[in-house]
Amino acid sequence: MARRLMYWQVYLHKTSIGAEFVLVKLLARVKELTHQGKKLPMTTALRFFVENHITKETFDTHALALFAQLDDYDIISGLKEWQHGDDWVLAKLSQMILNRDLLRVRLYRSPVEKEKVQELLREAAEQLQIPEELASYFVFTGEISNTAYRKDEQNILIYTKNNKIIDVTKASDQMNLDALATKVTKYYLCSLK
């Protein structure tokens, strides 16, 4: 139970979701602009992954070495440069992250109606004075889910007094993991404040 609560309160908190998806949109914009031929300032390691389509098959020792060099500095240094760039969308997304002025995130139990998303897209396009296509960087929806306990993937092991390691389900007859094994899905809507 604590695991599920931790995920919802920390990793799947609305602020965390908002920051993560603004960053995802920002990186998509960086990739889009780079593929259009625009030269954006960024570290060598980040540039490699932005300019190339890396798959499981193409992930070689060179890609691994560059991947190992990536850290938050690559992103932060990019954000600090891109916030002053001439692409308005990239600059705005960078400023949002740096200034911690993120999107509003609303969570729902069922998928968000397309009409609601379209209405918010129109409003954002008007407010920001940009085409609806670009407003989709600031208004979007999706789903998140959490399964607190998956015995087949990430079982919890208990070290007993008898020096044995057993699964938590066998360690206690008190543990009803059916409830924890249930996947909980929520739908999010990110939009301007």
Which residue stretches match the model-derived regions?
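Histidine-centered, transition-metal-coordinating active-site segments
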Residues: 1-193
